[in-house]
Each structure stands twice: as C-alpha cells, then as structure tokens.
C-alpha cells in the first residue's frame, strides 16, 4: 500500500508540473518544470 501511494502521488505531482509548464506557455516555464522534475 505504501509503495502504491508513493507511485500514485508521484504521477499526480508530475502531471501538475506538466500542467504548470503548459499553463505558463513559455520556454522558461518548461525549463523550470524539467528542473523541478529532475530534482524530484
């Protein structure tokens, strides 16, 4: 259960980063999303 919740939480977090990058609609937003995603 713990592992499953971790995976599910990661997917949701990743989707939020992608949405943020798309919402910004700029290279800066995309780069920030990739940097944050890479750290996590």
Curated annotation (Swiss-Prot):
Q: Does the keyword Hydrolase apply?
A: no
What Pfam families is this protein classified in?
Beta-APP (PF03494)
UniProt family annotation: Belongs to the APP family.
Location of this chain's protein in the cell: Cell membrane; Membrane; Perikaryon; Cell projection, Growth cone
Annotated site residue numbers, Cleavage: 7-8
Output a single Gene Ontology CC term carried by this record.
clathrin-coated pit
Q: How is it modified after translation?
A: Proteolytically processed under normal cellular conditions. Cleavage either by alpha-secretase, beta-secretase or theta-secretase leads to generation and extracellular release of soluble APP peptides, S-APP-alpha and S-APP-beta, and the retention of corresponding membrane-anchored C-terminal fragments, C80, C83 and C99. Subsequent processing of C80 and C83 by gamma-secretase yields P3 peptides. This is the major secretory pathway and is non-amyloidogenic.
- Its biological purpose: Functions as a cell surface receptor and performs physiological functions on the surface of neurons relevant to neurite growth, neuronal adhesion and axonogenesis. Interaction between APP molecules on neighboring cells promotes synaptogenesis. Involved in cell mobility and transcription regulation through protein-protein interactions. Can promote transcription activation through binding to APBB1-KAT5 and inhibit Notch signaling through interaction with Numb. Couples to apoptosis-inducing pathways such as those mediated by G(o) and JIP. Inhibits G(o)-alpha ATPase activity.
Query: From its record, what is one biological process in GO terms?
Result: cognition
Quote the subunit structure annotation: Binds, via its C-terminus, to the PID domain of several cytoplasmic proteins, including APBB family members, the APBA family, MAPK8IP1, SHC1 and NUMB and DAB1. Binding to DAB1 inhibits its serine phosphorylation. Interacts (via NPXY motif) with DAB2 (via PID domain); the interaction is impaired by tyrosine phosphorylation of the NPXY motif. Also interacts with GPCR-like protein BPP, APPBP1, IB1, KNS2 (via its TPR domains), APPBP2 (via BaSS) and DDB1. In vitro, it binds MAPT via the MT-binding domains. Associates with microtubules in the presence of ATP and in a kinesin-dependent manner.
Which UniProt key words apply to this protein?
Answer: Amyloid, Cell membrane, Cell projection, Coated pit, Cytoplasmic vesicle, Endosome, Membrane
Q: What is its main location?
A: membrane
Originating organism: Felis catus (Cat)
Give the protein name, as stated in the record: Amyloid-beta precursor protein
**Membrane topology recorded in Swiss-Prot or TrEMBL:** Single-pass type I membrane protein
